[in-house]
Amino acid sequence: MERKQRRTLVGRVVSDKMDKTITVVVETKRNHPVYGKRINYSKKYKAHDENNIAKAGDIVRIMETRPLSATKRFRLVEVVEEAVII
């Protein structure tokens, strides 16, 4: 039996204070069903970061996985773009 394609999302790391866990905010745009105006939606996901490589401000790709804790359902795949430190 073949496994389904897992969902991948790209977002920005907003917190890396927990050990082996990052909080990623994923922003999407959708049209309002009646008025047609573009509306920004954002949702936060907790993701598993085994080696603590992602830092706050990084753009990362996360992938859906089995439940790793009460709130973690995603894991870090790669750091797409590192944050610029000023």
From Swiss-Prot:
Pfam families (alphabetical): Ribosomal_S17
Q: Which PROSITE patterns match?
A: RIBOSOMAL_S17
The UniProt entry, under InterPro entries, shows: NA-bd_OB-fold, Ribosomal_uS17, Ribosomal_uS17_bact/chlr, Ribosomal_uS17_CS
Task: Give the record's keywords alphabetically.
Answer: Ribonucleoprotein, Ribosomal protein, RNA-binding, rRNA-binding
Q: Which GO terms describe its cellular component?
A: cytosolic small ribosomal subunit
According to the UniProt entry, its GO molecular function terms are: rRNA binding; structural constituent of ribosome
Q: Does the keyword Calcium apply?
A: no
Q: Name one GO biological process term.
A: translation
Q: Which cysteines are joined by disulfide bonds?
A: none
Q: Which NCBIfam families match?
A: PRK05610.1 (NF004123), uS17_bact (TIGR03635)
Q: What does this protein do?
A: One of the primary rRNA binding proteins, it binds specifically to the 5'-end of 16S ribosomal RNA.
Q: What family does the database annotate?
A: Belongs to the universal ribosomal protein uS17 family.
User: What is known about its subunit structure?
Assistant: Part of the 30S ribosomal subunit.
Q: What is this protein called?
A: Small ribosomal subunit protein uS17
The scientific name of the source species is: Streptococcus mutans serotype c (strain ATCC 700610 / UA159)
From the broadest rank down, the organism's phylogenetic lineage runs:
Bacteria, Bacillati, Bacillota, Bacilli, Lactobacillales
